[in-house]
Amino acid sequence: MNKSILLLTDEMNPGGVARHVVDLANGLVERGFQPIVAATDGPFRARLDEQIAFVNLPILARDGTHKSLIGFLASYRILNEVVRREKVTIIHSHKRYTDLLGRIVARRMSLSHISTCHNIFSSLKHVSFFGDTTIACSKVVQEMLIRDFGKKMQDVIQIYYGILPFREFNKKEKNQVFKALSISAGTKIIASVGQLIESKDRVTLVRAIGILRKRGEIDNVLFAILGDGEQKTMLEELVRNEAVHDHVMFLQGTSNVEALFNVADFMVLSSIREGLPYVILEAASIGKPHIATNVGGVSEFVIHGETGVLVPPNDPEKLADAIKDLLDNPEKVDLLGTSAREKFLQQFTYDKFIDRTGEVYKDYFTGHSHAS
């Protein structure tokens, strides 16, 4: 039985979807599938198992910031050739742009098409094209697909992300991280990881930091914001305007998240839209909790007062209060982190994620797909 599966996304730059595709591809190889990954090349390509074929698509323009019709048409031609040459049986697309691309290629070549929906959105519904079967990363996303996009319940499968846990650093390794980042030992670190884009709403985080500074509540506290994106210059200016430059450090998106999380006391997620963020699982895997905005599927992992702290989106005052509470109560941080790790181990492991996705593929191979 041919188990060649084309995993299609727009780019291999650092981000949750690229991470998801890489993890999925690597896990499928271990289980006897033959995944092929197709996307615009980027740093995350290096994380792919050496057995996995990679197809570089011109989806992103040379400046790496936008997509074009020329790139779409060129990618379409390349994918048709790859599908024929590699005898692909299933196209599994991620993100709306490549959902459309995958849909057209699948119909042209009479292939099965699966898509994964990673986020909550309401705009451009008329140009959203999902697969015969759509995998939803959270229950909230599943409900959105059925309610807002007219997907049939039997055609939407909810599968949580799963990751390999981060490694816990020893004291010597943590000291080395402090030294590498030029941070004084004993400084409390609060980490925020994700792209510097509108949906992640770091503006609210920086304003919350400004509130804490005015109250005199963040002496010996450093906020490490890791990520790249279009808002970086604006956020750097906001940091200066809020006079919190001594309390904020920006780190590139290619920086070591595992190392940062090992030295952080806890994390903050200030997004206004999310499906189910990888960073919450990564932190939980080593017992570090999040203060997170109650959006999308976040509350499916962050249970307020149990596995983390939930705050309303776009509310700097509430976010500042939550940060202050955890700074003042390290024992609460430890309890939240322990519970977060337990939830991770129960529901969000790598093996569960790979096995459940593999079952969806096998349904297509055996003619028992969920698609109508």
Predicted regions and their residues:
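Short hydrophobic beta-strand element within catalytic cores of glycosyltransferases
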Residues: 289-292, 302
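A conserved mid-protein helix/loop that constitutes part of the nucleotide-sugar donor-binding site
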Residues: 18-23, 188, 192-214, 223, ...
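Aromatic "clamp/platform" in nucleotide-sugar-dependent glycosyltransferases that forms part
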Residues: 253, 272
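Conserved acidic donor-binding segment of nucleotide-sugar-dependent glycosyltransferases
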Residues: 304-305, 309-316, 325-330
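Acidic anion/phosphate-binding donor-loop and adjacent secondary structure
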Residues: 143-147, 154-155, 162-180, 186, ...
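Short His-centered aromatic/hydrophobic patch
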Residues: 93-99, 117
